[in-house]
């Protein structure tokens, strides 16, 4: 999948699940489960409940996503 096909949207982390998976509420009110991208995992970026994040969604499954950026 190319980058042009993915959907990027802002959200807030609601809950931390096992294996670096998070429950994120998007700007439009939907709640999705998202995992950390490989570069964030490699650089030990910590994500806590309440953090603002950028989530990348695929058009095939809008309930799962990848966290690509944590806002300050």
Curated annotation (Swiss-Prot):
MF-aspect GO terms: ribosome binding; rRNA binding; translation initiation factor activity
Localization per Swiss-Prot or TrEMBL: Cytoplasm
Record domain S1-like: where: 1-72
Coiled coil feature spans: none
GO cellular component, one term: cytosol
Record key words, sorted: Cytoplasm, Initiation factor, Protein biosynthesis, RNA-binding, rRNA-binding
Family (UniProt): Belongs to the IF-1 family.
Description of how the protein assembles with itself and partners: Component of the 30S ribosomal translation pre-initiation complex which assembles on the 30S ribosome in the order IF-2 and IF-3, IF-1 and N-formylmethionyl-tRNA(fMet); mRNA recruitment can occur at any time during PIC assembly.
Function: One of the essential components for the initiation of protein synthesis. Stabilizes the binding of IF-2 and IF-3 on the 30S subunit to which N-formylmethionyl-tRNA(fMet) subsequently binds. Helps modulate mRNA selection, yielding the 30S pre-initiation complex (PIC). Upon addition of the 50S ribosomal subunit IF-1, IF-2 and IF-3 are released leaving the mature 70S translation initiation complex.
UniProt-recorded name of the protein: Translation initiation factor IF-1
């Amino acid at each position: 999948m190319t980058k042009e096909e993915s959907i990027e949207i802002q959200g807030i982390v609601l809950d931390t699940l096992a294996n670096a998976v998070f429950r994120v509420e998007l700007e439009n009110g939907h709640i999705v489960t998202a995992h950390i991208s490989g570069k964030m995992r490699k650089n030990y970026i910590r994500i806590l409940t309440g953090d603002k994040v950028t989530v990348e969604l695929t058009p095939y499954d809008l309930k799962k996503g990848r966290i690509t950026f944590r806002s300050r």
